[in-house]
């Protein structure tokens, strides 16, 4: 038995295919979803989506949004998403270093909050790459 997974951003469909299982980062922690999962709607945190296709696991960096799960269908609507295999490792590492530097020199609450969010996004992209290597 499989699940139909659809990952959408405002600009494109990132994934629309059948999967065996997913592990999703939510605002209250990670959840695993298998066929016949109880229906839920949940907020999606900045984090990694792990997708199992038979014996292979793929990763995707998700940048926050929400998910609806029910009737063996999963719809994830996020601000942005990238497959781990599509992320340039050098660019992601450089973005992480820039985000860390920006956090160190942030002044005031607003800059600190924005720098922390940028750092979380950059770390998630690097984690998505490292999870597949």
Swiss-Prot record:
Keywords: ATP synthesis, CF(1), Chloroplast, Hydrogen ion transport, Ion transport, Membrane, Plastid, Thylakoid, Transport
Gene3D superfamilies named in the record: 6.10.140.480, F0F1 ATP synthase delta/epsilon subunit, N-terminal (2.60.15.10)
Bilayer topology annotation: Peripheral membrane protein
BP terms from Gene Ontology: proton motive force-driven ATP synthesis
Pfam families: ATP-synt_DE, ATP-synt_DE_N
GO cellular component: a single term: proton-transporting ATP synthase complex
Molecular functions (GO terms): ATP binding; proton-transporting ATP synthase activity, rotational mechanism
Localization of this protein: Plastid, Chloroplast thylakoid membrane
Domain of life (superkingdom): Eukaryota
Keyword Phosphoprotein tagged: no
Membership in a protein family: Belongs to the ATPase epsilon chain family.
Complex and partners: F-type ATPases have 2 components, CF(1) - the catalytic core - and CF(0) - the membrane proton channel. CF(1) has five subunits: alpha(3), beta(3), gamma(1), delta(1), epsilon(1). CF(0) has three main subunits: a, b and c.
Protein name as catalogued: ATP synthase epsilon chain, chloroplastic
Organism listed in the record: Gossypium hirsutum (Upland cotton)
Protein encoded by which gene: atpE
